[in-house]
């Protein structure tokens, strides 16, 4: 494989694995199934293609099934295989499954796997399971609940491809929120084999009165996990019996239980590399940009905080379960309102302040310090916030072109045309966009400065966005800014981000302390001691209060 290379159809572009990619690709080829959680932009598509071509050439498989999201299939895999003249077939109708030939890469979206499950299973039977599965963005299979759309897709994927002889899962981030999300992926990989036994001697549950963990004996010790939801519950009670929450994560960070047993399962198949390890380039610089609310923002935030306080008390007035659920939904909505105020107070009718908020002013001040011949991106999560930031940017920078991309304005190919055409025609352009609108699809190496103006619930979602600008071919330094108000509920969200990232690092074989990771992600711990807590008043009713966060050892 050292001499392997691909030349595009015009003969002008050649690609070849570097030493690290070659080493890891060889490791995964030595196993029938493997997980390749390389960082975004590190060349997973190239490595997967190489492995598919190798197994086809050596008679190990008749077909290579590439399963991924629709945007990944249409804007990454299909153009890549076409560019390098590799035989492939995109499945858009069930009749297309009759038109595949031995040696083909068969590209199919997750939705069509669910819709054409019976027909795919027939192809698998006819090929005597002699197929190779490449599951790109495997984190899309992170649930098993029958009522969940993700759960339905996951079950269909397991039914079609669980018994294949060769499987390769790939994802820049294997989980979004907690380690329990890795179970469906491991189940697909190992297919209930002896390599995935329930090795935890003790299981754990949470005492509802004390909030502490209670251990009990595992009745399936050294046995296979039960199918589907029952197996998921055993996995959950083995390693993380409770979810991370906006409040709980600050008061008690959830460490992974039975960590040694989980690390053993992971070590069988995962080959983890960061972008720097694969490329040899240290281009990524993450920083925190702390902003200060203007008086109008502070007034609006206090209104939301007091309203939230009132809703918390109402939550326990009735013992009726439906009422409790309704109140809980109101609380969640109130948290989102507080976070929305932090991001862009101008979208609220009760806001009576200037058009350029304190957060916007902090971003614009930083942009003024950046050389004017550099392109800049500002990422948010809501269409109306895109429009508000774009309007403010046009006012603050009248001599610079401002482009916008929302989740509804453009189809994926239209977004690519906007980026590679109009946006890159200007050296000083500013792009304001929905973070999700660029994930898994577009590479924009021309952008060196990215502002995360609206924090997500996990860093893996945000990294899917900012790694659009940090690519394998990149040579310039890249700067990522996390914008936040330290004295707000965003401090809780930052703790949540770091805790989830710590779990992801564990799955990648890295044991890092909370404090070290806090600094590595660019946040300043002394500026985030104050956070919103849920407590109880003298009458035992829940209330919110501000406190100084103490970091546990």
Segments from the language model and where they lie:
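Conserved helix/coil segment N-terminal to the catalytic DExD/H
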Residues: 97-104, 111-129
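Inter-lobe coupling linker of SF2 helicases/translocases
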Residues: 107-112, 126-127, 150-165, 195-347
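Conserved RecA-like P-loop NTPase helicase motor core
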Residues: 403-492, 500
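Conserved Helicase C-terminal RecA-like lobe
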Residues: 3, 9-10, 15, 29-30, ...
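Conserved helix-turn-beta segment of the N-terminal RecA-like "Helicase ATP-binding" lobe
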Residues: 71-94, 189-192, 396
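A conserved SF2-helicase RecA2
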Residues: 460-466, 470-552
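Conserved Walker A/P-loop ATP-binding site and its immediately adjacent core
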Residues: 45-47, 60-83, 179, 381-384
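Conserved helicase ATPase motor motifs in RecA-like P-loop NTPase domains
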Residues: 40-41, 164-179
């Amino acid at each position: 494989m050292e001499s392997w290379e691909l030349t595009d159809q015009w003969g002008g572009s050649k690609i070849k694995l570097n030493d690290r990619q070659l080493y890891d690709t060889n490791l995964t080829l030595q196993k029938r199934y493997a997980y390749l959680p390389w960082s975004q932009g590190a060349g997973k598509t190239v490595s997967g293609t190489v492995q598919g071509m190798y197994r086809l050439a050596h008679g190990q498989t008749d077909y290579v099934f590439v399963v991924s999201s629709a945007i990944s299939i249409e804007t990454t895999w299909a153009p890549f295989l076409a560019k390098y003249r590799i035989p492939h077939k995109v499945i858009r109708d069930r009749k297309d499954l009759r038109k595949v030939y031995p040696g083909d890469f068969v590209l199919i979206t997750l939705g069509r796997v669910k819709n054409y499950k019976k027909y795919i299973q027939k192809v698998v039977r006819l090929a005597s399971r002699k197929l190779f599965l490449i599951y790109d963005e495997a984190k899309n299979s992170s649930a098993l609940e029958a009522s969940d759309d993700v759960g339905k897709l996951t079950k269909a994927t397991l039914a079609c491809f669980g018994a294949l002889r060769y499987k390769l899962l790939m994802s820049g981030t294997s989980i979004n929120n907690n380690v329990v999300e890795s179970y469906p992926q491991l189940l697909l990989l190992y297919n209930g084999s002896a390599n995935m036994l329930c090795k935890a001697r003790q299981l754990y549950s949470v005492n509802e009165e004390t909030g502490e963990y209670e251990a009990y004996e595992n009745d399936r010790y050294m046995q296979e996990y039960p199918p589907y939801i029952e197996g998921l519950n055993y996995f959950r009670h083995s390693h993380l019996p409770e979810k991370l929450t906006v409040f709980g994560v600050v008061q008690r960070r959830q460490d992974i239980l039975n960590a040694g047993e989980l690390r053993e399962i992971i070590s069988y198949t995962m080959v983890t590399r960061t972008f720097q390890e694969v490329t040899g380039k240290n281009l990524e610089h993450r920083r925190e940009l702390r902003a200060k609310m203007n008086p109008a923002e502070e007034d609006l935030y206090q209104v939301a905080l007091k309203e939230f306080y009132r809703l918390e008390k109402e939550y326990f007035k009735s013992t009726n379960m439906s009422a409790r659920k309704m109140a809980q939904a109101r609380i969640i909505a109130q948290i989102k309102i507080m976070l929305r105020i932090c991001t862009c107070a101008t979208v609220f009718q009760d806001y009576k302040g200037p058009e350029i908020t304190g957060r916007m002013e902090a971003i614009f001040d930083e942009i003024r310090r950046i050389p004017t011949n550099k392109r800049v991106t500002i990422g948010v999560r809501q269409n109306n916030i895109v429009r508000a930031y774009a309007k403010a940017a046009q006012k603050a920078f009248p001599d610079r072109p401002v482009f916008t991309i929302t989740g509804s304005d453009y189809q994926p190919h239209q977004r690519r045309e906007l980026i590679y055409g109009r946006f890159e025609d200007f050296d000083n352009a500013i792009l304001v966009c929905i973070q999700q609108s660029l994930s898994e699809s577009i590479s924009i190496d021309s952008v060196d400065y990215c502002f995360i103006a609206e924090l997500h619930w996990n860093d893996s979602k945000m990294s899917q966005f900012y790694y659009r600008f940090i690519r394998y071919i990149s040579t310039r330094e890249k700067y990522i800014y996390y914008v936040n108000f330290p004295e707000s509920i965003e401090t809780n969200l930052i703790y949540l981000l770091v805790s989830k990232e710590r779990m992801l690092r564990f799955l990648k074989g890295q044991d890092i302390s909370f404090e070290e990771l806090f600094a590595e992600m660019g946040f300043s711990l002394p500026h985030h001691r104050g956070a919103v807590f849920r407590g109880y008043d003298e009458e035992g009713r829940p209330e919110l209060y501000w406190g100084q966060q103490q970091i546990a050892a």
